[in-house]
């Protein structure tokens, strides 16, 4: 499993689809709070016709990626896009998360619930993110 550079995912006709926003995780509720706000904003912006979007954490917080994938699979979701809320593709996204995804896919396949899971590149690599950060830094330094 490798990180996909393209946001496009090929879906089988009639398949149910969802997205998981994946954050690193922390035991500090103050660190977690902005992710709940972000999820609410995305859901509101996408409206009722948007792709179902959930939040998961790689470690140190709940729901875990595994729990979220299993919940979605149990609800009949057959295609999941994972959008990492990371600044760059470090060790976690290059090694740890792909191993987690592969294990989840194998477990679900063995249980008779195959799910296609697509790992996308981290949002921090998107040009809009770099532009937004640059603008904030420039504003703060003026």
Show the residue positions of the predicted features.
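Active-site-proximal alpha-helix that buttresses catalytic centers in soluble enzyme cores
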Residues: 1-142
